[in-house]
Design a protein with these regions (language model features):
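Residues within the helices of the helix-turn-helix
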Residues: 32
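Short helix-coil-helix linker/hinge
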Residues: 10-18
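A short pre-motif secondary-structure segment
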Residues: 20-24
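DNA-recognition helix of helix-turn-helix
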Residues: 38-62
Length: 64
């Protein structure tokens, strides 16, 4: 199942990427909210989110 595969992928992802991805995609937090919550700059949040999304997208292609 794709949801199980996504959960497994996120569990194996680096923590710094997983946290940002979950806060944005699951908790629907803004970049500003994430940056304040994690004490990071917004550019760091955007970079980590881009890397996390790239990781997810690469694996999603394998699931098709």
């Amino acid at each position: 199942m794709k949801i199980e595969a996504l959960a497994k992928l996120l569990a194996s992802a680096p923590e710094e990427l997983r946290i940002v991805w979950v806060l944005r995609e699951v908790d629907d937090m803004s970049y500003e909210e994430i940056s304040q919550t994690l004490n990071l700059t917004e550019s760091t949040v955007r970079g980590r989110l881009a890397r996390a999304r790239s990781l997810v997208m690469r694996h999603m292609k394998e699931w098709e």
